[in-house]
Amino acid sequence: MIPRAHVTAGRSRAPWPTDAQVEQDLVLSRALVELYGNASVAQTVAFRGGTAIHKLFFTTPGRYSEDIDLVQIGAGPIGPILDAIRASLDPWLGEPKRKQGQGRVTMIYRFETTTRPIQPMRIKVEINTRDHFAVLGIQRRPFIVDSPWFSGHADIGIYRIEELLGTKLRALYQRKKGRDLYDLWLALTSLEVDDEKVVDCFRRYLEHDGLAVSRAEFEENLNGKLRNRSFLGRPYY
């Protein structure tokens, strides 16, 4: 998709081991600009998840990702939002494969790398259609892409870092993915974060899910994961 020379130029901002990953990172970065350059998208969804943390809070991302996690800000039909997302991405990424589950809609865009060996890659856009609230509000953060292949910028609607980490804590408790622990460790040791607000956001999201978790229960849950090789084996993806 992207000329090799432009992929090489992108290495200064995307320090990944393979050209295919650099190419995919450029595609993901352009997708963010295209999405939030569309008012119909920017006004209706907020950016969340590990990609949001690494792309908007770190000068150099600490983890490779192929996912764009969005949250529908207000309750309402999801159809117009999906149409706006596709209007931003389909013209240059093609038609996505769409899946719908409980509380979420996923669109997967597939493409092949230009760099050899040619590899199939994907960008996954997932919209949470359930969490229609923000504990600490939504802020706008600038995001810039400056590449010979594509240049652009957008103000991206995103949760505050404490709320992003609070939802990461929820993810760490509810699933077995080492990247959740890695993201929390990196952010808490590298950024200025109010720990109490992180815990408060975690509790608020659990309440929204109808759950209550004690510290002892959380520690037992985490200790069980730390004994699992699959949890520890791939913490960065």
Predicted regions and their residues:
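Structured mid-to-C-terminal alpha-helical surface segments
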Residues: M1-V45, L56-Y64, I68, Q72-Y237
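Glycine-rich beta-strand-to-loop/alpha-helix junction loops that act as flexible
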Residues: F47-A52
